[in-house]
Amino acid sequence: MSILLKDVALYQNGEIHEHSNIVVDGKLIREFPKHPRNEDYDEVIDGQNMLALPGLVNTHTHVGMTLFRSYADDLALMDWLQNKIWPVEEHLNDDIVYWGSMLAFAEMIRGGTTSFCDMYMFMNACGEAAEKAGMRGNLARGLAGVSPNASSALQENIELFKKWDGAGDGRFKVMLGPHAPYTCPPEYIKKVRDIAEKYNIPIHIHLCETKGEVDNCLKEYGLTPIALMDNLGLFEQPTLAAHCVHVNDNDIKIMAQKHVCVAHNPGSNLKLASGIAPVIKMRNSGITVGLGTDSAASNNKLDMFAEMRLAALIHKANNYDPFAVTAKEAIDMGTIEGAKCLGYDNLGELESGYLADIILIDQSGFHWHPRFDSISLAAYAGNSMDVDTVMINGNLVMRDKELLTIDTERVFAEVSRVTKELYSFT
């Protein structure tokens, strides 16, 4: 099927090209004709007053935790995990995670997010919800070596890989999800490493999120979490490290040498008082840094426009440098850099031959005027409610701000039902 996105403002190569046209053929972007004829295409979408951006890439999520939104706020990370989140997680099941995930995907699509990278439990349920919604996703079974089900969870991750890697017309990839060094002892990390090497599976892990995590690791092993994982050989496989807030120069050197990608979660890190990651140092060292929301339990929304704006603002202030993260760099972190974090080299840019994950942003709002610079407006003034049309893998999943793949009324009803079930134990 061929689709023409007609007369859009096209974001390409860091510039805006007004009155452009995008032709999508199947799941790929085909061309950018100057004078297209409507009758040559199966469908034509009027892009007047629309800004075309690559679909946003959320590099670190726990979508099943969306049902924890507003349940446990204003707490430090370990208090939040140990006393609030982990006890409730004991009562999760496939049905609860499916509808929590579907709620997350409705929010993501509505806000222009087309790809997500998730680590959690009941990941088949997450995958089924993502497939129904039409999302693109990297799935990982969260692994905790200190858990009674440590071995079975690792086997679940292998089965997840066999079932979902490459599924959904190529929309899904599978990663291994060792939670963190403080939940995965060295011997368990070695098991994860060996399986990663055997099946050629990339890694998704939390690292250096808090100062306490780093201090405890130094006390127990004499190494930072980054140095410990490197010492154990985990970084021999492609690795996406979430957070990396408390990393030193040697950590950054290791990450750059081993091509470790970073999922920067500014909103979650600020809310949990974890700190501000040294993103400028990492990027200047050649490390690929994408953006993530973390879960709705710790953010509390899955809004990549908010994360792009935060990424641009906090690093300016933290470095006393107005050029620290520019509007363009913030958008690129939310698109092309995020796509690289997920293992793609044909996603995150609007170029011929690239996967057709495209969003059209309505520029008619008051906050889009006057329009001197649409790139700056997208990064600093735009918000998720501006998104009008969303395409994933060449398929329309939202048009005229209406979700096409998700029954929102049913989602709200099912979320109400499973939330009552989940919290009946508390």
Locate each region found by the language model:
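Divalent metal-coordination and catalytic microenvironments
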Residues: 8, 22, 27, 49, ...
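Alpha-helical scaffold segments that flank or form the walls of functional sites
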Residues: 69-135, 156-167, 416-425
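Active-site microenvironment of metallo-dependent hydrolases
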Residues: 1-20, 24-25, 30, 34-38, ...
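Active-site gating loops and adjacent loop-to-helix segments of metal-dependent hydrolytic enzymes
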Residues: 67-99, 106, 133-144, 211-238, ...
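Metal-coordinating catalytic core of metallo-dependent amide/deamination hydrolases
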Residues: 125-245
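His/Asp/Glu-enriched, well-ordered alpha-helical/loop segment
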Residues: 231-234, 238, 280-365, 381-383
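Catalytic core of soluble alpha/beta enzymes
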Residues: 209-233, 237-239, 244-257, 270-281, ...
